[in-house]
């Protein structure tokens, strides 16, 4: 590991605290509004389903990008700073404070000294050195991550002490604090990687900074994985976290057929079922259903202004005839999205105008999707 750092001194540096620029505007996000409810009840088991059993408990590498990965990573582990759901600001994650340099490319972080992994080890600034050693390693067999965390995007990591470091992004961004808000990789857990990485960690979950852990004794191969909440989770009583992550356990069971899962949901053996398909909302579970009328099931539609996934028709513009912009514009005008939304989705969906909607002031204020028009097409 040390040899890797020494061979890439353009990407990794160690400096003293005195070398941190003066005059930085340090923020801690504690002025943001708390968005969780003190009335939330803690305890019990949250029962959900997945369509297939995970092929590994690794979150990186072959077979790791399945549906269950989110329960270990996205829904659970903390990043340096967290995007506030109701404002354009950030609240503390693993970092207790942060500051953006004048170049809008470098962000300085101070780790929360309370931050721990689930194995009790302290989160250290050096784990962000190790993050890049890990993500750039050939042994993880993950070309996408090798590329994403490459030195052409993340230019440099600089350590100042055990809890203070900076990350330099490749270009200035208005949301650069979020761009470099990464999750650490615990060096004490992995050490130097080798060709045994995939097999060694196939069913050995990485220590997490989040509240829930997956342990071998809570895995029923082929049937379910149960995540258990840590009783002594380090962020349990901190603002923005104290009224969240309330179930004692999250049981994720395998139900391969979507219709079968719906039947199990109606029996009360699954606690939540997405009704995104219109036939489920309007036909299979109408408002007149006795389970709904008697209050046993709640049908809820959420409206939000958060960034949606970049759903789009992807066009390969490198080859003829789609390398012609006029043809691509005509293709746009030939797409009758309004008809699709009205007939298939019954008016419940709204067409995005760009691939970056929902970013508040950062989204384009006037750009509109091209309308359906046979004449223009």
What do the PLM-derived regions correspond to, one by one?
Residues 15-16, 23-34, 44-102, 133, ...:
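N-terminal lobe/hinge region of extracytoplasmic solute-binding protein
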Residues 40-41, 110, 145-194, 200-203, ...:
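Surface-exposed binding/hinge segments that line
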Residues 43-52, 96, 106-108, 131, ...:
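Short, well-ordered beta-strand elements
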Residues 54-62, 88-91, 118, 175-178, ...:
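Short, solvent-exposed loop/turn elements at domain surfaces
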Residues 65-67, 71-78, 82-86, 181-249, ...:
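Gly/Pro-rich hinge or "lid" segments in bacterial periplasmic/extracellular proteins
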Residues 97-141, 166, 261-264, 321-324, ...:
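Aromatic- and charge-enriched surface segment that lines or borders ligand/interaction sites
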Residues 138, 142, 157-159, 215-226, ...:
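Extracellular/periplasmic solute-recognition and catalytic clefts
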Residues 351-377:
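Structural transition elements
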């Amino acid at each position: 590991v040390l040899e890797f750092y020494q061979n890439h001194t353009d990407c990794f540096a160690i400096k003293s605290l005195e070398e941190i620029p003066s005059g930085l505007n340090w923020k801690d996000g504690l002025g943001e509004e708390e968005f969780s409810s003190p009335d939330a009840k803690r305890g019990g088991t949250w029962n959900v389903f997945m369509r297939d059993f995970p092929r590994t408990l690794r979150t990186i590498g072959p077979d790791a990008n399945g549906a269950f990965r989110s329960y270990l990573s996205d829904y659970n582990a903390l990043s340096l700073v967290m995007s506030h759901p109701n404002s354009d600001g950030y609240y503390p994650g693993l970092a207790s404070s942060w500051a953006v340099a004048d170049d809008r490319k470098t962000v300085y972080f101070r780790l929360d000294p309370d931050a721990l992994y689930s194995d009790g080890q302290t989160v250290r600034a050096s784990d962000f050195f190790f993050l890049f050693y890990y993500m750039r390693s050939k042994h993880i067999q993950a070309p996408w991550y090798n590329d994403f965390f490459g030195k052409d995007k993340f230019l440099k990591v600089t350590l100042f002490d055990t809890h203070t470091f900076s990350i330099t992004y490749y270009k200035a961004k208005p949301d650069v604090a979020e761009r470099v808000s990464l999750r650490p990789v615990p060096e004490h857990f992995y050490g130097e990687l080798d060709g045994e990485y995939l097999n060694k960690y196939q069913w050995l979950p990485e220590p997490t900074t989040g509240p829930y852990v997956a342990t071998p004794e809570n895995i029923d191969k082929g049937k379910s994985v149960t995540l258990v909440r840590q009783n002594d989770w380090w962020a349990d009583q901190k603002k923005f976290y104290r009224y969240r992550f309330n179930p004692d356990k999250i049981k994720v069971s395998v139900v391969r057929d979507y219709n079968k899962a719906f039947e199990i949901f109606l029996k009360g053996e699954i606690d939540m079922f997405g009704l995104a398909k219109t036939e489920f909302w309007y036909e299979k579970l109408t408002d007149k259903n006795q389970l709904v009328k008697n209050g046993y099931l709640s049908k809820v539609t959420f409206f939000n202004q958060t960034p949606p996934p970049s759903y789009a028709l992807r066009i390969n513009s490198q080859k003829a005839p789609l390398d012609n912009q006029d043809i691509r514009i005509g293709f746009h005008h030939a797409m009758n999205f309004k008809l699709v939304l009205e007939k298939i989705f019954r008016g419940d969906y709204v067409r995005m105008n760009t691939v970056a909607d929902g970013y508040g002031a950062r989204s384009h204020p006037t750009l509109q999707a091209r309308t359906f028009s046979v004449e223009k097409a």
